[in-house]
Amino acid sequence: MDHMSHNMDSMASMTSTMTMAMSASSTASAPMSTGSAHSMGGMDMGGKDSMHSCKISMLWNWYTIDSCFLSSQWHNTSRGMFAGSCIGVICLVICLEFLRRVGREYDAFIVRRARLRNQYLSTTASSQGLTRATDADASAEDSPNSTRGVVRAASKGAGRTLCSAFEDKTPVRPTLIEQLVRALLHMLQFAVAYFVMLLAMYFNGYIIICIFIGAFLGSFIFSWEPLNLQKEYVIPLPLPYLPQMICKELGLTCVLV
C-alpha cells in the first residue's frame, strides 16, 4: 500500500510538472508570435517603401516614374509630375537665354550712354569753335588770301573735331555700380547654367531632350536681334557734295562740316 501511494504521488508530481512546462512554453510562444508578426509587417512596409524609392542611374536611361533630380524631394511619382518636370527644365533653359540677352543689352546700354556723353561734350566744344571760325571767315572776306587760308584751315580743323566726336570708338570702362550689376547678371547666368549641367548629369533622355528644346526656344526668342553686318562710316564732306539724302540711301553717316 505504501508502495502504491508512493507511485501515485510521483505520477501526480510529474503531471503537475508537465502542466507547468506547457503553460510556460505557451506563455513564451506568445511574444515570439507577436514579434514575428511585427517583423513580417515591417518587411511588408519596407517592401512598399522600396517600391517607391528613387531611380538614379549614371548611364543613359528613360526613367519617368520614381525618377528623382537634385534632391529626394524632387520625386516624380506619376507621369503628370514627370511632364511638369520636363516643362520646368525647358523654362529653366529659356531663363538662361533670357539672362544672356539681358547681359548683352546692359553692356550695349553702358556703351551707348558713355559715347553719347562724350559726343555731347565734344560736340558742344566743337560747335563753339566752329562758330568762332565761321565768324572769323565772314570778317576775313575782304582780307588777303593768306589770312583767308588760315581761317579756312581753322574751320576745317573744327569740322574734323566734330567728326571725331561721332566716330569715337574708344573702349568704355564701366563705373562701380555698373560693374556690380554686370557681375550680378553673370552670377545668375552661372548659377542657372550650373543647375542645367547637374540635370544633364542624370543622363535621363527626356530631360536632355528638354534641355535642347529650351536652348532652341530661348535662342529663337532672345537672340532675335538686329545684326550690324554693314560697317558704319563717318564721312566729313561738305553738304553740297554729298547730300544727306544720298547718305541715308547708302546707309552712311554723314556729318556736315
Swiss-Prot record:
Record's keyword annotation contains Membrane: yes
Keyword Transferase: no
Expression triggers: Expression is up-regulated by copper deficiency and decreased dramatically when the copper concentration increases. Expression is up-regulated by the deletion of ctrA2.
Membrane association type: Multi-pass membrane protein
Catalytic reaction(s) noted: Cu(2+)(in) = Cu(2+)(out)
Superkingdom in the source lineage: Eukaryota
Annotated Gene Ontology cellular component terms: plasma membrane
GO molecular function, one term: copper ion transmembrane transporter activity
Disruption phenotype: Exhibits a reduced copper content and leads to cell decolorization due to lower laccase activity, when ctrA2 is also deleted.
Keywords from the named record: Cell membrane, Copper, Copper transport, Ion transport, Membrane, Transmembrane, Transmembrane helix, Transport
Transmembrane portions of the chain: 79-99, 202-222
Chief localisation class: membrane
Places the protein is found: Cell membrane
Family listed: Belongs to the copper transporter (Ctr) (TC 1.A.56) family. SLC31A subfamily.
Function, in words: High-affinity copper transporter of plasma membrane that mediates copper uptake under low copper conditions. The mechanism driving the transmembrane transport of copper has still to be determined. Acts as a potential virulence factor.
Protein name: High-affinity copper transporter ctrC
Natural source organism: Aspergillus fumigatus (strain ATCC MYA-4609 / CBS 101355 / FGSC A1100 / Af293) (Neosartorya fumigata)
